[in-house]
């Protein structure tokens, strides 16, 4: 299955799985989690706080960034 989502205003296509969760975007979108670049990591799907295990679907709008 293939879906396209928007990550930080950039279209990203996920391929190779039957279903996807938030954490799967890290396989397709370059975001460094190894170094803290703020006080907290913000993870949203369609404007709502998301956990890494949250399912995502076609057209989801995803924000992931460090907040100070």
Task: Describe each PLM feature range.
Residues 1-68:
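Ubiquitin-like/PB1-type beta-grasp interaction modules and other compact soluble beta-rich domains
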């Amino acid at each position: 299955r293939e879906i396209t989502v928007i990550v930080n205003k950039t279209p990203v296509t996920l391929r190779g799985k039957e279903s996807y969760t938030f954490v799967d975007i890290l396989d397709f979108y370059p975001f460094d989690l190894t170094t803290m670049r703020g006080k907290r990591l913000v993870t949203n799907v369609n404007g709502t706080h998301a956990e890494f295990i949250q399912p995502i679907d076609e057209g989801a709008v995803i924000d992931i960034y460090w907040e100070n």
